[in-house]
């Protein structure tokens, strides 16, 4: 058995605070990392079926959020996965859809988050272009402009994300 540490830890001057995610695994966690300055924060929020109010509250105030944008719902529903797996992925304990991610990104931009990396994309049920489009269209519809109000990148397994300065 592996014990899950729910306490804050410090490594090289960074404070790392785990938080619970909504996923069908034992003790799924995301992380808020506070920089050496004690102010600048980043979050990693993947393997979550939906963004709970608690999760949103926890990552509010982060300058950078690395967030799951796992699947396009239409691709998932018409794709090769059996219905039982589709149902699990679409559940509150599955994975975050592009649209649900876009909703979270919009809420976070409204609260001051400026940098996003869309992550944990399904190879079978998503494309980087669809993930990017869902978030940027939602942000545009609320009047946010890319490179003014936010910077958004898509992480893929094939390419490194590069260094992001916040």
Regions found by a protein language model. Give the residues of each.
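Core dinuclear metal-dependent hydrolase active-site scaffold
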Residues: 4-64, 158-159, 163-166
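Short, acidic/turn-prone active-site loops that include or flank metal/cofactor-
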Residues: 2-8, 70-73
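Cap/insert and terminal regions of metallo-dependent hydrolase folds
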Residues: 53-154
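A generic short-segment signal for beta-strand/edge and adjacent turn/coil regions
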Residues: 1-2, 13, 31-38, 83-88, ...
């Amino acid at each position: 058995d592996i014990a899950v540490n729910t306490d804050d830890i410090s490594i090289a001057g960074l404070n790392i605070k785990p938080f619970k995610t909504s996923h069908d695994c034992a003790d799924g966690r995301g992380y808020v990392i506070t920089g050496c300055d004690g102010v600048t924060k980043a979050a990693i929020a993947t393997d979550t079926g939906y963004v709970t109010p608690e999760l949103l509250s926890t990552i509010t105030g982060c300058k950078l959020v690395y967030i799951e944008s796992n699947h396009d719902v239409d691709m998932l529903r018409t794709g090769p996965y059996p219905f039982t797996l589709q149902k699990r992925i679409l559940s509150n304990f599955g994975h975050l859809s592009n649209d649900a991610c876009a909703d979270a990104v919009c809420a976070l931009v409204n609260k001051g988050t400026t940098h996003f990396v869309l992550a944990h994309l399904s190879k079978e049920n998503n494309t980087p272009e669809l993930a990017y489009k869902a978030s940027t269209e939602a942000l545009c519809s609320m009047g946010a402009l890319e490179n003014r109000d936010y910077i958004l990148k898509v992480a893929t397994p094939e390419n490194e994300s590069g260094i992001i300065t916040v």
